[in-house]
UniProtKB/Swiss-Prot annotation:
The keyword Cell membrane applies. It comes from the Bacteria. GO terms for cellular component: plasma membrane. It is found in: Cell membrane. The chain crosses the membrane at residues 27-47, 50-70. Its main location: membrane. It is a multi-pass membrane protein. Keywords: Cell membrane, Membrane, Transmembrane, Transmembrane helix. This is Uncharacterized protein HI_0870.1.
C-alpha cells in the first residue's frame, strides 16, 4: 500500500515513511535483522535527496540508528533478557 502512494508523494517523504515502518516487527527482531540490508540503500537515497542542514541532520539520525540497531547484541532475548545461543529455550521452559 505504501508503494502504491510512493509515486504520488515527495520522494524524501516516501523514503522516511518506508524507514519508519521498516522496523515494525519489534519482538521478532531476529527475522527483521535479515532485512536490515535494505535499510542501507534507503538511507543512502534519502541522504542523496536532501541538501544542506537536512543532510547533516539525517546523517546524525543515521549514525544514531546504526548505533542502536547494528551494535546491539543479537543473542539477547528481547522480553526475557537471557543471553543464550538458543533464544527461545527460556520461553518454552517458563511455560512447561
Amino acid at each position: 500500500m505504501v508503494l502504491y502512494f510512493y509515486n504520488k508523494i515527495n520522494r524524501s517523504f516516501g523514503l522516511m515513511i518506508l524507514l519508519y515502518f521498516f522496523r515494525s516487527g519489534g519482538l521478532a527482531f531476529r527475522i527483521s535483522e535479515l532485512f536490515l540490508i535494505f535499510s542501507i540503500p534507503l538511507f543512502a537515497l534519502l541522504i542523496n535527496e536532501l541538501s544542506g542542514v537536512n543532510r547533516v541532520l539525517m546523517f546524525f539520525i543515521l549514525v544514531y540508528y546504526i548505533s542502536i540497531v547494528f551494535l546491539r547484541r543479537i543473542y539477547v532475548h528481547v522480553v526475557f533478557g537471557v543471553n543464550t545461543f538458543l533464544p527461545y529455550k527460556p520461553i518454552f521452559d517458563s511455560y512447561l
